[in-house]
Every structure is written in C-alpha cells, then in structure tokens.
C-alpha cells in the first residue's frame, strides 16, 4: 500500500463522501455541455429556479438568473456577501405583468423541504475568467 495520497485519490474520496454519505448527485465537469465563460450549471439552476418558484413569470426567473451571473461590482468579500444573502434570503426582482410593475423574491433554496433542492457535486469543472480555472470540487 502506498504511503502517498495523490490528488486524484483525495478528489475521489471527497466525491464519494458527498455521494454516499450526503446523497449528492455526481457529475464529471468535462461531460457537461455548457458555456465555459459561466461557472454556473445553468441548465440545472434554471430548472431549479422554476421548480422552487412556481407561478412566477419567466421575466422574474430570468432577472434572478441575470443577477446571479452579473454581480461584478466590489471586491471578493463583497461578492461573497451578496451571494450569501441571495442563498439565505432569495433574490429581489422586479417584473411587469399587463404593463404594471411587480416585485417579489426568487428563492434559490427551499429550506422547508430539502428534497425540493438539487444537490450536485462536480469535479474538473473548467470555466474561463481571465484564464482557465478548474476547481477540484464544486458543489
């Protein structure tokens, strides 16, 4: 038995932990057809936004997705605070129905019924932001 723990072993151990102990679905990043300039798993995210926010119009869901993809202002700490607020409290959006403006919250997580959420662990998820980035694990 080797005394060395290589990176792939570590990565696989983490994936197994999330799959077997926590019930996450596993996806291998290179197998997913997507926009490499966006770090989000947009297909699953969009489906989840519609599922968790039934009855909201497309414009509300699309604005929430836009806000998730474009909060560029501020330093990393500020961006993390904004994202954490979105996770905990939802994303405030405005939309029009019949020429009248409405506002609501689009939720990213169902805290009351966890089975309504998607839990996915991915590895080798490459995205491009100034250069190629490939975190070992993304949740």
Give short role names for the model-derived ranges:
Residues 1-139:
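An alpha-helical interface "stripe"
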């Amino acid at each position: 038995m080797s005394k060395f723990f290589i990176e792939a072993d570590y990565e696989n151990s983490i994936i197994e932990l999330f799959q077997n102990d926590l019930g996450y679905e596993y996806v291998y990043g290179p197998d997913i057809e997507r926009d490499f300039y966006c770090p989000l798993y947009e297909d699953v995210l969009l489906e989840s936004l519609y599922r968790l926010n039934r009855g909201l119009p497309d414009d509300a869901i699309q604005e929430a997705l836009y806000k998730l993809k474009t909060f560029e202002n501020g330093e990393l700490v500020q961006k993390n605070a904004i994202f954490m607020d979105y996770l905990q409290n939802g994303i405030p959006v405005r939309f029009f129905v019949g020429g009248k403006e409405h506002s609501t919250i689009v939720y990213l997580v169902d805290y009351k019924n966890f089975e309504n959420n998607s839990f996915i662990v991915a590895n080798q998820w490459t995205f491009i932001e100034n250069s190629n980035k490939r975190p070992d694990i993304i949740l």
